[in-house]
Curated annotation (Swiss-Prot):
Record's subcellular location: Cytoplasm
Entry binding sites for K(+): E43
EC number(s) stated in the UniProt entry for this protein: 2.5.1.6
Pfam families registered for this protein in UniProt: S-AdoMet_synt_C (PF02773), S-AdoMet_synt_M (PF02772), S-AdoMet_synt_N (PF00438)
Origin species: Sodalis glossinidius (strain morsitans)
Record gene name: metK
Name of the protein in its database record: S-adenosylmethionine synthase
Residue sites binding L-methionine per the record: E56, Q99, D239, K270
């Protein structure tokens, strides 16, 4: 693999699937703020004029599902029927039950350290040294483009932008290293009265140029800005949205493997979410320690069992110490039992709504992005405890 291209995409907070993710995580946060031991599995469906919030929730907390839903949509920016969706007038339906007692008996334990996994499954974490946040460049810059779209929409720089948008960035690699950007796609919903030439110029000057490093752009870089020519109908009016349908956008943009489990709306007892965060934490600390240039961790669980059924490390030939030694370090310094990783990363906090747009990884303020174990790993790897 000497020279190759790699592409990742992202979507804005106003994309229908991301509206659903944010509502699910807003419900989760509101419950965790009152009841950190709650069990939450909240799913959301959005379509023109309606929102359905469902799932299984067991908690002592009370939250106003309807108001949470409306306020979330309002913050995203759907506040008028002209946009095809209005937080103030859409119907909000609720269909929420309790978590199955069969699951409860496998998860809950008298000794918290023996807390079982909430389900079986495998989760992956990944890190690479190709960006400052130790994330793949394609997904990092795809996220930054749509985040910038939101910023200039909300601060009035480009007031004719609307909430729904998508980005896609194709990077060129040579021998595993980024050498440039081959193509950029940015599609953004807009008001009906904006002309396409004006939109293209504004998007280039206010969104693309401020985000993408100039040294990676060239005369050969291709730009596709609203390539269909018109994007007035968007959001839930254009497509229905569902929680958990953007799992590649949420993670590594396809650069790493994915276990298949979505994140949003799930409390940390669900290892689909918490173990994926812990796996990112492990991989990032290995790369931050300089023990590998790229690192992918797989961890797997059996429902009701505390200890992971497997921990596997792949470093793609970039490791500085033998893989067996890396695995031993991970087992020594990271507690990947459900209760252990929840405690290690302080996951029983209402911090999840923010994760539901622009990526769960590569954003330094989240606890799973800390590199506080890197020095310990490096010291131990060198035999200097």
């Amino acid at each position: 693999m000497a020279k190759h291209l790699f592409t990742s995409e992202s979507v804005s907070e106003g994309h229908p699937d991301k509206i659903a993710d944010q509502i699910s995580d807003a419900v989760l946060d509101a419950i965790l703020a009152q009841d950190p031991k709650a069990r939450v599995a909240c799913e959301t469906y959005v379509k023109t004029g309606m929102v359905l919030v469902g799932g299984e929730i067991t908690t002592s907390a009370w939250v106003d599902i309807e108001e949470l839903t409306r306020s979330t949509i309002r913050e995203i920016g759907y506040i008028h029927s002209d946009m095809g969706f209005d937080a103030n007038s859409c119907a909000v339906l609720s269909a929420i039950g309790k978590q199955s007692p069969d699951i409860n008996q496998g998860v809950d334990r008298t000794d918290p350290l023996e807390q079982g996994a909430g389900d079986q499954g495998m989760m992956f974490g990944y890190a690479t040294n190709e960006t400052d946040v130790l994330m793949p460049a394609p997904i990092t810059y795809a996220h930054r483009l749509v985040a910038r779209q939101s910023q200039v929409r909300k601060n009035g720089t480009l007031p004719w932008l609307r909430p729904d948008a998508k980005s896609q960035v194709t990077f060129a690699y040579d021998n595993g290293k980024v050498v440039g950007i081959d193509a950029v796609v940015l599609s953004t919903q807009h008001a009906e009265d904006i002309a396409l030439p004006q939109l293209k110029e504004a998007v280039m000057e206010e969104i693309i140029k401020p985000v993408l490093p100039a040294e990676w752009l060239s005369a050969q870089t291709k730009y596709f800005i609203n390539p269909t020519g018109r994007f007035v109908i968007g959001g839930p009016m254009g497509d229905c949205g569902l929680t958990g349908r953007k799992i590649i956008v949420d993670t590594y943009g396809g650069m790493a493997r994915h276990g298949g489990g979505a994140f949003s709306g799930k409390d940390p007892s669900k290892v689909d979410r918490s173990a994926a965060y812990a796996a990112r934490y492990v991989a990032k600390n290995i790369v931050a320690a300089g023990l590998a240039e790229r690192c992918e961790i797989q961890v797997s669980y059996a429902i009701g069992v505390a200890e992971p059924t497997s921990i596997t490390i792949e470093t793609f030939g970039t490791e500085k110490i033998p893989a067996d030694n890396l695995t031993a370090l991970v087992r020594e310094f990271f507690d990947l039992r459900p209760h252990g990783l929840i405690t290690m990363l302080d996951l029983l906090q209402p911090i999840y709504r923010e994760t539901a747009a622009y990526g769960h990884f590569g954003r330094e303020h989240f606890p799973w992005e800390k590199t506080d174990k890197a020095e310990l790993l490096l010291r131990d790897a060198a035999g200097l405890k």
